[in-house]
Every structure is written in C-alpha cells, then in structure tokens.
Amino acid sequence: MEPISHLVKSSLPNYLSSLPVPDSIGGWFKLSFKDWLALIPPTVVVAGIGYTAYLAYCPAARASCSAKISGRCNNQIRKNEPKVVDMIDVEDIAEKAAFCRCWKTKNWPYCDGSHGEHNKQTGDNVGPIVIKK
C-alpha cells in the first residue's frame, strides 16, 4: 500500500507540476519541441480514459463495438439444429444462384443482399457464394 500512497501523494503531483502548461493561450505557441513531447504522455492518458468512458456510457458506441467483436455469425436461422446444412442439386439451378454466407438473409439459403447492412455495421466484407451452371 505504501507504493500506491507514494505514487498518489508525491510522484504524481511532482510530475504534473513539472509539466510545461502555459498560463495563457499565447503561451501554447511559445512551447518548444521538448515541451510538446513532455505533454504527449498525459494527453494520451486523458484521451484513453475519455475513449473508455465513451465506450462504457454511449449506447451507440457499445452497439457498434459489440457488433464488431461478436463471435457468432448465425443469430436466427434454424437455431434448434446442431449444424445447419442445406443440400441443393445443381440440376435445380436455372442459370445461377446466390447463396448466403452471412446468415442475415430472410430467404435462407438464398442471398437477399442483407450482408450489405452487416458489412456496414461490422466492417466485414462478406458476400454471397454464386453458383453458375
């Protein structure tokens, strides 16, 4: 506990008081390159804390982030089966058929273009598998 106490009561205040923070707006333009380098670490820490708070408390950021890191791809199609397998005879295909690979289609197993919205939300680049005769 003593190291934490020393950090909070002595080291951190000494570090912060030694930072070259100017008293006026004009003082920012007079900082040297070395002064600017000294201001980078606390700026990165403050930005990191702000970004973490943004992800924690902003619903839009949370939804976007969780969509990108979600490991499951099938969220709705035949969830009662242990493995979804569809057999399609090549003779049944007229000229060509596009099959879904993103699991977002409402017309399973055929692609209806739902991957476009999925790609926008997740940054993915999935598309259909197209079979030609």
UniProtKB/Swiss-Prot annotation:
InterPro entries: CISD1/2 (IPR045131), FeS-contain_CDGSH-typ (IPR018967), FeS-contain_mitoNEET_N (IPR019610), MitoNEET_CISD (IPR042216). Residues 1-35 are lumenal. Binds 1 [2Fe-2S] cluster. It is a single-pass membrane protein. It is found in: Endoplasmic reticulum membrane. It comes from the Eukaryota. The chain crosses the membrane at residues 36-58. It comes from Drosophila sechellia. Residues 59-133 are cytoplasmic. Its cofactor is [2Fe-2S] cluster. GO terms for cellular component: endoplasmic reticulum membrane; mitochondrial outer membrane. GO terms for biological process: intracellular iron ion homeostasis; mitochondrial transport; regulation of autophagy. GO terms for molecular function: 2 iron, 2 sulfur cluster binding; metal ion binding. Keywords: 2Fe-2S, Endoplasmic reticulum, Iron, Iron-sulfur, Membrane, Metal-binding, Transmembrane, Transmembrane helix. [2Fe-2S] cluster binds at C100, C102, C111, H115. Gene3D superfamilies: CDGSH iron-sulfur domain, mitoNEET-type. Belongs to the CISD protein family. CISD2 subfamily. This is CDGSH iron-sulfur domain-containing protein 2 homolog. The gene is Cisd2.
